[in-house]
């Protein structure tokens, strides 16, 4: 049995195949996922697993150098926005790097997901609970 933190074989595989600057999306239950992008559906029911639970597990194994959010999260979901920023701040301290955070419109965000290696769908049912994580290097 795998000893690492990610037991889901699809997520583990995607993370292990990421190269520098490749992207991985963690999203809420409502984000449309392009047919051209691999979908890893973790949603069991509303809120399970939560967006932050999925982000937490993914970032335990993924080296992150940047994150892209929809600008709308600031106004429409400020509590989750703050929670995510705090998590990313703690992650950069743990990794010993600076994680660049940028924002784009939700419409542009949806277009960017088409270039990601995969989209991991959580059971989150709150607005704009989506992030594009950009892979860094560990050296």
From Swiss-Prot:
Associated pathway: Carbohydrate metabolism; D-ribose degradation; D-ribose 5-phosphate from beta-D-ribopyranose: step 1/2
BP GO annotations: D-ribose catabolic process
InterPro entries: D-ribose_pyranase, RbsD-like_sf, RbsD_FucU
Pfam family, one: RbsD_FucU
EC number from the UniProt entry: 5.4.99.62
Catalytic activity, reaction form: beta-D-ribopyranose = beta-D-ribofuranose
Keywords attached to this entry: Carbohydrate metabolism, Cytoplasm, Isomerase
Compartmental location: Cytoplasm
Subunit architecture: Homodecamer.
HAMAP family: D_rib_pyranase (MF_01661)
NCBIfam families given in the database record: PRK11797.1 (NF008761)
Protein family (similarity comment): Belongs to the RbsD / FucU family. RbsD subfamily.
UniProt-recorded name of the protein: D-ribose pyranase
Source species: Salmonella paratyphi B (strain ATCC BAA-1250 / SPB7)
């Amino acid at each position: 049995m795998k000893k690492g933190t990610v037991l889901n074989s699809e997520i583990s595989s995607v993370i292990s195949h990421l190269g520098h600057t490749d992207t991985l999306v963690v999203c809420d239950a409502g984000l449309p996922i392009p047919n051209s992008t691999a979908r890893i559906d973790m949603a069991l029911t509303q809120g399970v697993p939560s967006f932050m639970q999925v982000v937490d597990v993914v970032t335990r194994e993924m080296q992150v150098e940047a994150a892209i959010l929809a600008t709308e999260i600031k106004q429409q979901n400020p509590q989750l926005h703050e929670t995510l920023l705090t998590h990313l701040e703690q992650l950069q301290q743990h990794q010993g790097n600076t994680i660049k955070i940028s924002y784009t419109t939700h419409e542009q965000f949806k277009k960017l997901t088409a270039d990601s290696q995969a989209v991991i769908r959580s059971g989150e049912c709150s607005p704009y609970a989506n992030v594009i994580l950009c892979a860094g290097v560990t050296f």
